[in-house]
């Protein structure tokens, strides 16, 4: 269990630093679209897709590596990667309605929670 915790810790830290570096490098290039964040999300989705595909075939891989790369690195780089993988799994299972609902709930829910947080913060600091 300690090895798994350390794997998440190391992978998460590394992914977070990678995301920060991408943001510092690419976000200033375009005012309306944070290109570094987009790159982190797309890269994380690609890595987790490759990771899950690879780990499903390489069943003898130590679980520490799986957790380091997927939960740790991709989780630190972006949580969008996990969401993307879950939608792809639903699509592969032929559960198209659930996949689309998952997309709507995750995206709209995330936007709504962000807006709610901004509203709560603004309301609490208005006076």
Curated annotation (Swiss-Prot):
Principal location class: membrane
NCBIfam families: crcB, PRK14196.1
Molecular function, one GO term: fluoride channel activity
Protein residues bound to Na(+): 75, 78
Source organism phylogeny: Bacteria, Pseudomonadati, Pseudomonadota, Gammaproteobacteria, Enterobacterales
Transmembrane segments: 4-24, 35-55, 71-91, 103-123
Activity control: Na(+) is not transported, but it plays an essential structural role and its presence is essential for fluoride channel function.
One GO cellular component term: plasma membrane
Subcellular location: Cell inner membrane
Similarity comment: Belongs to the fluoride channel Fluc/FEX (TC 1.A.43) family.
Name of the protein in question: Fluoride-specific ion channel FluC
Keywords: Cell inner membrane, Cell membrane, Ion channel, Ion transport, Membrane, Metal-binding, Sodium, Transmembrane, Transmembrane helix, Transport
Membrane disposition: Multi-pass membrane protein
A Gene Ontology biological process term: cellular detoxification of fluoride
Keyword Transmembrane helix (UniProt): yes
InterPro entries for this protein: FluC
Organism: Escherichia fergusonii (strain ATCC 35469 / DSM 13698 / CCUG 18766 / IAM 14443 / JCM 21226 / LMG 7866 / NBRC 102419 / NCTC 12128 / CDC 0568-73)
Function of the protein: Fluoride-specific ion channel. Important for reducing fluoride concentration in the cell, thus reducing its toxicity.
Reactions performed catalytically: fluoride(in) = fluoride(out)
